[in-house]
Curated annotation (Swiss-Prot):
Keyword match Transcription: no
Protein's organism: Influenza A virus (strain A/Memphis/18/1978 H3N2)
UniProt keyword Hydrolase, yes or no: yes
Name of protein: Polymerase acidic protein
Gene name in the database record: PA
Molecular function in Gene Ontology: endonuclease activity; metal ion binding; RNA binding
Length: 716
């Protein structure tokens, strides 16, 4: 940077900047960005003043070449660049001559035409933020502020820009050139990020009148006036010991600090009860796809056309029958619903032209499955005021469920690799700055690790289903629309592939509020026999609908094909978040990036390449009863992604509560591991808050089990 400054700026400016830094005791060999900033600021001040004169009539004129005959006076007095003593002498002289108010801080220029001091700012941040900082520091209406940025923006007091447009354009062009030259040498990012805000001396902000009375009225209990409260807050040390904090609090706070030792924490108590059940909106590891490679059929890309084409690839259909009934439902209706789908798809195929969408006939079985006319009638509250025994209907407490092994299996499967590529991140232009090059490299490495991951398939499946369902809910509110569950991917050889998982039938969807529910029936293909883990499929009615021939190492074998049918519901807000499941990729990439940054700061160089290419190194993935599990960096990427995806698929109030409360206990345990001797009060209350979130959600129960494994190994 120092070499660049000496090449880029006039030697006189460089010399003045060196003097200024010496005066403030700063080393330009170390503070190279500051050196560049001072030179830039000096140059802008000089350019501001250049060629601007006042003629004999007192008018401001621009003269580019000196005319020896003209009696001209410089319009601007330059204060910036002089040593402090000389600068204050000039300021005092101007004030004595013109009667101007003496400024608190040294300004940069004095404008003889407008009779005002000018503060020039050059910022690498946003102009309005820098302007406010300057104004806050100067606190004077008599000093005019004019801010320039390296992006061509400017801001001035009362939008009075002092100079003509051409003069300002010269300054902006010069700043843009400096930025380009820095970027070409890889210096811009460091320079841009090094800017600090204006340092201001804090002053007491006095409140008077009505605002003062309101402030006195709105104090916490036990405070008589604002001054007392201020004194209390000022004396409240943010990093003081916890006992000191408690002693400052209200007398009603009665908390005894207990030391937190290795023997203090107990495991989180998981609930007893029947095993938990699958509650995701679509099947995960148990899903089966009917696929077509290199689709090129007529109407390719139209979901209904793609679905019919995929259905035609399977020849083992048979008369469906129920193998696992839903305990509370009318199972014959689920069976009739599937038969209706098959019949109506057959009707479509017999038509001359296949329609783009299909609305199902409103049969009794679909009306039942979609809860048509089942909602209680809504009555306006004003019409009920006179009813004496009006009360909210009683709702049962949810039944406690115990952790079941299937959810750990689901998670393990989500971390695995498939033989397909599920994401292709579009190119986003050529990298200009070094930081962009590093970001692209990290993104590409990460994409390579997760593009084949099953969790990524779940993302694309979730995005498609939620988008299709939300579209249909808005476009066909009264119809029972048939929505194919589709995803698209590429084979390892790069061939395109369209997959059909099953169908959704949407119920009536007059969704006014974000939380209004649309019911739907999902029908999904699977090779999983529900009789092996019936508790997992509590909410489903499962049919056997065909036999599938599978190729294996020992030849062909036939497996029964099942259809998992259930009634479900979702809302606008849930569909909106479902459509944005790609955010999970970003979240897990950022977590990986923080690991790379930590490694890079230790080694003092970017470690991205080594991080991803050193295949021999293992990293901690998580805790299990066996101890800390470790794996390759690819496995870490896929595990973090799977966690993020499951947080989206199994989002619930139970998860929100558990995450927030267990984090507090986690921080205390980490403080103990770091030998910080933590103390706690009401640890029992914290355990209570954590355990009240453990009700029946499989993902929350699994996280609690992992947390217990962590406690065991962390406190050995």
């Amino acid at each position: 940077m120092e070499d660049f400054v000496r090449q880029c700026f006039n030697p006189m400016i460089v010399e003045l900047a060196e003097k200024a830094m010496k005066e403030y005791g700063e080393d330009l060999k170390i503070e190279t960005n500051k050196f560049a900033a001072i030179c830039t600021h000096l140059e802008v001040c000089f350019m501001y003043s250049d060629f601007h004169f006042i003629n004999e009539q007192g008018e401001s004129i621009v003269v580019e070449l000196d005319d020896p005959n003209a009696l001209l006076k410089h319009r601007f007095e330059i204060i910036e660049g002089r040593d402090r003593t000389m600068a204050w002498t000039v300021v005092n002289s101007i004030c004595n001559t013109t009667g101007a108010e003496k400024p608190k801080f040294l300004p940069d220029l004095y404008d003889y035409k407008e009779n005002r001091f000018i503060e020039i700012g050059v910022t690498r941040r946003e102009v309005h933020i820098y302007y406010l900082e300057k104004a806050n520091k100067i606190k004077s209406e008599n000093t005019h502020i004019h801010i320039f940025s390296f992006t061509g923006e400017e801001m001035a007091t009362k939008a009075d820009y002092t100079l003509d447009e051409e003069s300002r354009a010269r300054i902006k062009t010069r700043l843009f050139t400096i930025r380009q030259e820095m970027a070409n040498r890889g210096l811009w990012d460091s320079f841009r990020q090094s800017e600090r805000g204006e340092e201001t001396i804090e002053e007491r902000f006095e409140i008077t009148g009505t605002m003062r009375r309101l402030a006195d009225q709105s104090l916490p209990p036990n405070f008589s006036c604002l001054e007392n409260f201020r004194a209390y807050v000022d004396g409240f040390e943010p990093n003081g010991c916890i006992e000191g904090k408690l002693s400052q609090m209200s007398k009603e706070v009665n908390a005894k600090i207990e030391p937190f030792l290795k023997t203090t924490p107990r495991p989180i108590k998981l609930p007893d009860g029947p095993p938990c059940f699958q509650r995701s909106k679509f099947l995960l590891m148990d899903a089966l796809k009917l696929s077509i490679e290199d689709p090129s059929h007529e109407g390719e890309g139209i979901p209904l056309y793609d679905a019919i084409k995929c259905m035609r690839t399977f020849f083992g259909w048979k008369e469906p029958y129920i193998v696992k009934p839903h305990e509370k439902g009318i199972n014959s209706n689920y069976l009739l619903s599937w038969k209706q789908v098959l019949a109506e798809l057959q009707d479509i195929e017999n038509e001359e032209k296949i329609p783009r969408t299909k609305n199902m006939k409103k049969t009794s079985q679909l009306k039942w499955a979609l809860g048509e006319n089942m909602a209680p009638e809504k009555v306006d509250f004003d019409n009920c005021r006179d009813i004496s025994d009006l009360k909210q209907y009683d709702s049962d407490e949810p039944e406690l469920r115990s952790l079941s092994s299937w959810i750990q299996n689901e998670f393990n499967k989500a971390c695995e690799l498939t033989d397909s590529i599920w994401i292709e991140l579009d190119e986003i232009g050529e990298d200009v700055a070094p930081i962009e090059y590093i970001a692209s490299m990290r993104r590409n490495y990460f994409t390579a690790e997760v593009s084949h991951c099953r969790a990524t398939e779940y993302i694309m499946k979730g995005v498609y289903i939620n988008t299709a369902l939300l579209n249909a809910s808005c476009a066909a509110m009264d119809d029972f629309q048939l929505i194919p569950m589709i995803s698209k991917c590429r084979t390892k050889e790069g061939r395109r592939k369209t997959n059909l998982y099953g169908f959704i039938i949407k119920g009536r969807s007059h969704l006014r509020n974000d939380t209004d529910v649309v019911n739907f029936v999902s029908m999904e293909f699977s090779l999983t026999d529900p009789r092996f883990e019936p508790h997992k499929w509590e909410k489903y009615c499962v049919l056997e609908i065909g036999d599938m021939l599978l190729r294996s190492a020992i030849g062909q074998m036939s497996r029964p094909m099942f259809l998992y049918v259930r009634t479900n519901g979702t809302s606008k807000i849930k569909m909106k978040w479902g459509m944005e499941m790609r955010r999970c990729l970003l979240q897990s990439l950022q977590q990986i990036e923080s690991m790379i940054e930590a490694e890079s700061s230790v080694k003092e160089k970017d470690m991205t390449k080594e991080f991803f290419e050193n295949k021999s190194e293992t990293w901690p993935i998580g805790e299990s009863p066996k101890g800390v599990e470790e794996g390759s960096i690819g496995k870490v990427c896929r595990t973090l992604l799977a966690k993020s995806v499951f947080n989206s698929l199994y989002a619930s109030p139970q998860l929100e509560g558990f995450s927030a409360e267990s984090r507090k206990l986690l921080l205390v345990v980490q403080a103990l591991r770091d030998n910080l001797e933590p103390g706690t009060f009401d640890l029992g209350g914290l355990y209570e808050a954590i355990e009240e979130c453990l009700i029946n959600d499989p993902w929350v129960l699994l996280n609690a089990s992992w947390f217990n494994s962590f406690l065991t190994h962390a406190l050995r």
